[in-house]
Amino acid sequence: GILSLVKGAAKLLGKGLAKEGGKVGLEFIACKVTNQC
């Protein structure tokens, strides 16, 4: 169902973020927190 699709997408995103490294993730979190996205 939809939940399994969401879980699969989340896993792929997690792997992608891990490959890109923590820097990109931290920048994204920072811009979200400061509403600069």
Swiss-Prot record:
Signal peptide: none
Disulfide linkage: C31-C37
Coiled coil stretches, renumbered: none
A Pfam family reported for this protein in Swiss-Prot or TrEMBL: Antimicrobial_2
Main location, first listed in the record: secreted
Localization annotation: Secreted
InterPro entries: Antimicrobial_frog_2
Gene Ontology BP, a term: defense response to bacterium
Domain of life: Eukaryota
Tissues expressed in: Expressed by the skin glands.
One GO cellular component term noted in the UniProt record for this chain: extracellular region
Keywords associated with the record: Amphibian defense peptide, Antibiotic, Antimicrobial, Disulfide bond, Secreted
Family: Belongs to the frog skin active peptide (FSAP) family. Esculentin subfamily.
Function field: Antimicrobial peptide.
Name listed for the protein in its UniProt record: Esculentin-2Ra
